[in-house]
Amino acid sequence: TFYSERYLTTLRLRQLHNLLAGIAYEHLIILANTDTYGGGGIYNSYTLTTARHPMFSPVVVHEFGHSFAALADEYGYDEYTPEYTPETEPWEQNITTLKDLSVKWGNQLPANVKIPTPVTSKNKKKIGLYEGGGNQTKNVYRAYQDCRMRTNTAQEFCPVCQRALKRLIQFYVTEGPAAE
């Protein structure tokens, strides 16, 4: 899909929903019976990943971040056509173009944060403005050096992604915005 051998989607979503008619569900996780690496997460729709690849577990968690909480990829490609411009703030909660950081993790940044925040061992567990995210290497920033939305080796979601997940769960549980 989208000219990527590892990006999985389904062209039969309507058929899938018809098959599930009458069954109560909140979120779909589709497992493909293959050992080929890949996955995809469509916000508010489904997670799809391969079930027999050795990296299955971290990939399904990453794709769930997309499909459940609308989290963006936190990695970039040099050859990628820019999707995000400095004039527009991305709607995903874990990336920014610095257009309007106040609505995201701006209140969690240390005073005098460097832009971009250097990727160093000293900053490993610090919230900052690290360049690279939304499939772009430039002009898009993420909050943490490493996160489940960046690599398969990260053990957990970063604090900003965790907050986005908690806010969404709280919204559904309390039928309103989450308290901070």
What would you call each of these model-derived segments?
Residues 1-79:
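Active-site-proximal segment of zinc-dependent metalloprotease catalytic domains
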